[in-house]
Amino acid sequence: MSKEIPTPYIWSYQPQTGHAAGASQDYSTQMNWFSAGPSMISHVYGIRDLRNKVLMTQAQITKTPRTIMDPPIWPASMLVQKHATPKTIALPRNHTLEQAMVNCGAQLAGGRQPSPSHIDIKDTMLAGTGIQLGEDIPSVSWIRPDGIFQLGGGSRSSFSPTQAFLTLQQASSTPRTGGVGSYQFVREFVPEVYLNPFSGPPDTFPDQFIPNYDIVTNSVDGYD
């Protein structure tokens, strides 16, 4: 009975390459035979069988259809592409310089604080992606109509910003290819239910379950 209800293989993730790093059986689901009677053993087998059916159903729902479990290079069409939302950042201001420029009739185009800015525009949402200036202007709620500052244009504007803002958004680029991210890995590599594991010769065992299997060369390191 234990051979007919196999223990699932749990996949390991290699974040540097975005590929699977082998799979091992989840022995935490094994029965403690020293304290289990026939009734308890039968009950646990029923639970394990139901769990395996749930895992196989989940794999059919979340896995992307493919002929190779872990392709060396995942095409862009099979990868979840992250689309970063526009991010607005408050820029540093130099109010003394701005007032002096206004008094001289100059148009404002930014400014700088006397001390180094402590505003950090580095963000994990922008890591690894191109950025460009956003096409949208800041909300009118950020602008006050007191006529103190002059905006870009030939005549004096009745609107003046209380704070300068910069909007960044992801630049268009070629969709990413390669390995999967951690979020997609959980969906693609559901715990594997390997049915009838002892029904064939050893060479029929899936190589991709072995941690040192190389998907590029289709070989296991240290073995012919």
From Swiss-Prot:
The membrane spanning regions, by residue number, are: none
Q: Where is this site: Cleavage?
A: G111, R112, G154, S155
**KW Transmembrane helix (keyword) present:** no
**After translation, how is this protein modified?**
Cleaved by the viral protease during virion maturation. May cause the middle segment to be shed from the capsid.
Any idea which GO molecular function terms this record carries? hexon binding
Q: Which GO terms describe its cellular component?
A: host cell nucleus; viral capsid
Gene3D superfamilies to which the protein is assigned, alphabetical: 6.10.250.1460
Q: What keywords is this UniProt entry annotated with?
A: Capsid protein, Host nucleus, Late protein, Phosphoprotein, Virion
Entry-linked InterPro entries: Adeno_PVIII
Q: How is this protein induced?
A: Expressed in the late phase of the viral replicative cycle.
Question: At what positions is Phosphothreonine found?
Answer: T64
Q: Which residues form the propeptide?
A: 112-154
Assembly and oligomerization: Interacts with the peripentonal hexons as well as the hexons in the facets. Part of a complex composed of the core-capsid bridging protein, the endosome lysis protein VI and the hexon-linking protein VIII; these interactions bridge the virus core to the capsid.
Q: Please share what else the UniProt entry notes about this protein.
A: All late proteins expressed from the major late promoter are produced by alternative splicing and alternative polyadenylation of the same gene giving rise to non-overlapping ORFs. A leader sequence is present in the N-terminus of all these mRNAs and is recognized by the viral shutoff protein to provide expression although conventional translation via ribosome scanning from the cap has been shut off in the host cell.
Family, as annotated: Belongs to the adenoviridae hexon-linking protein family.
- Its name, as the record gives it, is Pre-hexon-linking protein VIII
Organism of derivation? Canine adenovirus serotype 1 (strain CLL)
**Which gene name belongs to this protein?**
L4
